[in-house]
């Protein structure tokens, strides 16, 4: 199995009842239902040109507009056949896009990766993560591309990638 499949099974194959506990935070474009009028009023932001987090932004927009999201059990099948290298590259673009969305104020801490980033930032541990990125990110990337199917390692790699971005919150740069 591919890295994409392993991640999909672990992160996307979550029952609707569990995702419904925090409906906007767990938003994904393949398993929700909203009123047609709501969708037309709050459609996906066409200005996003980079891969990744279009659905995250859409979910946040719905939350800010106090719109109800109903999660449904709708299995996702990834038929694109991305190699592990292609999947990691897409993930990197998605994290870079997420950083841009955070900087522009469109994404808040309801997004789990950003919430972890902010917690590390507040506690002063982000500097350690940034050092770990310098020391280990390329090795971890090689492991992921080379066949390691660890969701934990993949999530850590995403955090390392995000820590490479300067994200200004308030008057300070991080």
Predicted features by range, described:
Residues 93, 110-174:
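Non-catalytic, C-terminal membrane-associated alpha-helical segments of glycosyltransferases
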Residues 65-89, 94-105:
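Active-site donor/metal-binding and catalytic loop motifs
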